[in-house]
């Protein structure tokens, strides 16, 4: 049960990190 929570937590963290990176890149591209 603990392993499943850790796995889902890291997956959602990675997805959030990717989303933030993509959003930041899009903002920089639009700013130019």
UniProtKB/Swiss-Prot annotation:
Molecular function as annotated in GO: electron transfer activity
Transmembrane segments: 5-25
Bilayer topology annotation: Single-pass membrane protein
BP term (GO), one: photosynthesis
Pfam families, per the entry: PetM
The entry's keywords: Chloroplast, Electron transport, Membrane, Photosynthesis, Plastid, Thylakoid, Transmembrane, Transmembrane helix, Transport
Keyword Membrane: yes
A single cellular component GO annotation: chloroplast thylakoid membrane
Keyword Chloroplast in record: yes
Superkingdom of the organism of origin: Eukaryota
Subcellular location: Plastid, Chloroplast thylakoid membrane
Quaternary structure and interacting proteins, as annotated: The 4 large subunits of the cytochrome b6-f complex are cytochrome b6, subunit IV (17 kDa polypeptide, PetD), cytochrome f and the Rieske protein, while the 4 small subunits are PetG, PetL, PetM and PetN. The complex functions as a dimer.
Similarity section: Belongs to the PetM family.
HAMAP family, per the entry: Cytb6_f_PetM
Function in brief: Component of the cytochrome b6-f complex, which mediates electron transfer between photosystem II (PSII) and photosystem I (PSI), cyclic electron flow around PSI, and state transitions.
Protein name as annotated: Cytochrome b6-f complex subunit 7
Organism phylogeny: Eukaryota, Cryptophyceae, Pyrenomonadales, Geminigeraceae, Guillardia
Name of encoding gene: petM
């Amino acid at each position: 049960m603990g392993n499943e929570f850790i796995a889902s937590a890291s997956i959602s963290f990675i997805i959030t990190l990717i989303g933030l990176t993509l959003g930041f890149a899009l903002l920089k591209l639009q700013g130019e």
